[in-house]
Structure formats: C-alpha cells, structure tokens
Amino acid sequence: MANKMKIHLEADYKTFTAFCPVYRPGGQLAAVEMLTHFAHAQANVVIPQEILIPQLNEHQRVLLLQDQINIIEKHYAFFSSHNINVAINIDERLAETILGSDFLIKKMNQLDCIELEISESFPDIAGGKNNPCLQGLSQHFHLSLNNYGAGKATSKAVFDNLFYRIKLDRGFIQHNIKRGSFPPFISAILDHIKPHCHAVVVQGVDDISGLQSIRHFAFDGIQSALFPPVNEEGLSHLLDPPYLLQQPVLQ
C-alpha cells in the first residue's frame, strides 16, 4: 500500500513501506527491517531506497524519516506487545540530522522498538567509539550493523560494543557457505563477535539447503529471501512461525 508522501526530484515518486522479517532459529519473530521503496508516479518503475535516498536533500530526508516514524508509531502497540524491534536504515547525513535535533531524539526514544541500521560504508566506522557520530548514536539508540563481513571496515566498532544487532553480509555468506572450511570459519566468527552484541543475524541464506546448513550454528536470527517482506496490513502474519523453521534440523 503506497503512502501519501510524495517526493519530487526529476520526477514525482510515491513511497510505500515493507517490513522484512528477522526470525529466531525456532521461528519466533525477533525484528523487522523497515524498507521504503519509491514508485514512479507515471511509469511502472519501483526504485529501492538505497538508490534514491542519496539523491534527497536534507528536507526530503527529514520528511521521509518523519513518515517512517509515523508508521512505526501507528503500529507501536503491535511492536511493543510482541517485543519486536524495527530497524530504520540511515546514512551519515541522516545520522547527523538526528543527532542535531532534540525533537527527533525525544520522539524516537518514545518508540523504544526503533533500531538505527548502518552499513560498513558508514564514514570512519573503523574509528569505533572514537567516531563522535557513531558514539552519539549508540548513546541514544540501539544500533544495527547491516553487512558485517563486506570487507569495508575493521572490527573496532564491534569490539567497542557499539552495536545491539550485527547482521552478517549476504554476499559474504553466499560466497563461503558451500566451502568445506565454512563450519569452523563461521563458528570462529560467531565466537569472535557474539560477546560484543545482543544478537547476530545471518543473511543471504536464500535456499532450503543453505537454511539447513546454517541452523547448526549459534545464530540469533535469520533474514532470508525465503521469508519475504510484507506491507503494513500483513504485519500480523509475520507472527506465524515459518514452516521451514519448524522442521527438524537435519544431522
């Protein structure tokens, strides 16, 4: 369902929101990632947020963030009653806007289900807690790292305990999962990072055989194309444990 918000660049776009589930290995819904897509007003074209958001000016970015906050607030009773966190993707520009606004910080802190999600390409992420922007965000919000293992950053920010949730990079998983060295390799990574965050999520396991493989490891969550996103009206359906996660783990 498209939201009423319109954004004008070289053409008009309408936004619509989807929620991508993160399930615990046993099938319980742990969190959702909030995805905003942009639909061209005339052409039948949908553009993902990572392509269009960098083109937005500061005013448009704040409007989009406020729209996301309003949607979370609308469904807050659902998220709160089921202990579900909601991740909003941000970049450095939006992070600085948030930290510069007492109003936004207060408003977002009232919705304690909000996580702010950044990628390894976040500027100076290697600085960890010595990065004032990262440190400021972690003091006010739960932070999620979207693509750990993409190879663009050191682990200092992880070892500085800045992240509530760490998601392994989907390309990293897909590149390594069929290798014979994967079991000891991924076990070592989990031992390495689990003491420094609340939850480690695996991404990129998008087929049944891969899903069976990773269920042998101590991941706290699974985000996969096998569990597709839903719109606002479908949120309650995400509470039903996926059939694939109710099956016994093959030995």
Language model features with spans:
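Bacterial c-di-GMP phosphodiesterase EAL domain
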Residues: 2-109
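Pre-DFG segment of protein kinase catalytic domains
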Residues: 145
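EAL-type cyclic di-GMP phosphodiesterase domain
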Residues: 40-66, 92-142, 171-192, 208, ...
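EAL-family c-di-GMP phosphodiesterase catalytic domain
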Residues: 2-18, 24-25, 36-43, 117-124, ...
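Short, well-ordered coil/turn segments that N-cap beta-strands
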Residues: 81-86, 110-114, 139-142, 164, ...
